[in-house]
């Protein structure tokens, strides 16, 4: 369902996406429930299971995991070998949370970004100078915000990339 949701022709079509969204959340919840003991324990503590997600109003019952939870521990639902891209939070308070993306998740995200960029005419062959309000990417900086900011410069050929922050 995730792939179908991310491949919708019109990303803003609520009617077409509502049922797919619910099914994708249920599918995602079931995956993490089956592959991550820590996540399963949290859901069970709140008497929640993926099958509980039957209608849109059930989404509000899905236990939220605060950012602080991930800063204090590393939990994964997939082996590190399947994580093609790893990123961290900025760690502004001294602790970073970590996330990994597999090929399927990256492809879904890329397809949606391309679809939205096309819809808003963001692609161009005309070169541009980019000013990024963030850090320049390098091996020591694995923050997701840096990777995302760099990705935003791929919509049109870059004449230059100027970064506002120094690492």
Region roles according to the model:
Residues 1-19, 60-167:
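Active-site phosphate/ATP/adenylate-binding loop shared across adenylate-forming ligases
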